[in-house]
Structures are given as C-alpha cells and as structure tokens.
Design a protein with these regions (language model features):
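Conserved phosphate/pyrophosphate-binding and hydrolysis machinery centered on Walker-type P-loop NTPases
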Residues: 19, 38, 51, 63, ...
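Extended interfacial segments that mediate partner engagement and assembly in macromolecular machines
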Residues: 26, 75-144
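Conserved, well-folded catalytic cores of nucleic-acid-processing
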Residues: 14, 18, 36, 51, ...
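Long C-terminal interaction/binding lobes of large macromolecular proteins
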Residues: 101, 128-197
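Cys/His-rich Zn2+-binding cysteine-cluster or related metal-binding knuckle/ribbon modules and their
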Residues: 2-8, 17, 30-84, 88-92
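Core recognition of P-loop NTPase motor domains used across DNA-transaction enzymes
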Residues: 40, 45-48, 59, 71-75, ...
Length: 197
C-alpha cells in the first residue's frame, strides 16, 4: 500500500469523487498536478474556484450561463418556433454539435416517483410559459422509464396546445453491428423504421 502525504491523499480523494475517475486515474492526475509548474496549478485552481462563482442558470431556459446573459436565448438566428426539451444543461452541449438551430428548455431532471420526484419538482411551470411562439417541441430525453414517464406527462399536457410534439428517434448507431445491439433498441428501430424513397 502506498503512503501519500496528507495533502496529496486529500487531492486523490477529491479526484476519486468525480464520475468516471477511479483510484488509479485520481493518483495519476494528482501526481501530474504535483509535478506541474506553480502557474499551471494556480490557473487550474482559479478556474475551479471561478466556476461555481460565475456559472448560473438562465431564468428563461435554465441553460448554464455566465454574466447573466444567455447566448442561446439572445441569439437572433435561433428559431423561437422550435423548442428542444432536455433533462440537464449538459445535454445541450451534445445537441449543439448537431447544429440544432432552435432553443432549449432544461427540466432539471426527470419524473421519478421512486425517487420522490414529480412534475412539481421540475422546471415545467417556466416551460409552459414559453409556448406562445412555439410550433414544435422536441423531447430530447433519455429513453428510460423515467424519461418515458416524463415524455408521457409532457405530451399529455401539450395536447391543449396546437403544437407538434416529437421525440428523438431511437435506433441503431451508425457503424455498429446488429449482433451488438440490445433487444429494446432493435425493437424500437424496427417499430420506428423509415421508408427509403
């Protein structure tokens, strides 16, 4: 068993708390920081400290913002008629890579009765206030029990509006082999198949 000085051990413990970081990776990261120049460590520390001070949620869409200005809500080139609903702000980063040009609404979670999370615990109230100009709502929510429950709730609530409701297609990833696809994904892919024209 390796005996680390207390300060290094504390840093390893902190890195180990991060998702996807095991003990070995935490050790490597900590030793890398220990061996880095003081300026690099100071910049890293400053970035961490500044993160919690400067990042907030947009009052309209609940996206992550800095300096009280939401670059998505304020972008005049984005369509107000297309609203993509996501679970977390980090989902937006993924969808942005697809060059989506609508706006977003972050729910802040999914309906999960087993965890005591119902519609009142999520950002639905602010969502329904935004629907005046919206013509289509895209539900970009995880295909899980909680995700399906949340989509069912939303689609039921949206019936009173003249809004098109869609969800992300569920299917087989490009470049994958059928033998490695799970049964649920394969079933959804067959049910949601599209005609080749």
């Amino acid at each position: 068993m390796t005996v680390y000085p207390d300060s290094l051990k504390k840093l390893i413990d902190q890195f180990s708390k991060l998702p996807g970081i095991g003990k070995k990776t935490a050790e490597r990261l900590s030793i890398f920081i220990l061996n880095s120049k003081k300026e690099v460590v100071a910049d890293f520390s400053h970035s961490l400290n500044n993160l919690k001070k400067s990042i907030e949620s947009c009052d309209v869409c609940n996206c992550l913002i800095e300096n009280e200005s939401c670059h998505i809500c304020n972008d005049p080139y984005r369509s107000d008629e297309l609203l993509c609903v996501v679970k977390d702000p980090t989902d937006i980063f993924l969808i942005e890579k697809s060059s989506f040009k609508g706006k977003y609404h972050v729910l802040g979670g999914l309906i999960s009765p087993l965890d005591g999370i119902d519609a009142e615990n999520l950002n639905f109230e602010s969502f329904f206030k935004r629907l005046d100009q919206v013509k289509e709502v895209i539900l970009a929510i995880d295909p899980s029990q909680e995700g399906d429950m949340t989509m069912l709730y939303l689609s039921d609530q949206l019936k009173k509006y003249s809004i098109k409701i869609s969800r992300l297609a569920r299917g087989i990833p490009v470049g994958s082999s059928l033998e490695f696809i799970d049964q649920v994904t394969l079933t959804h892919s067959l049910n949601d198949r599209v005609e080749i024209k």
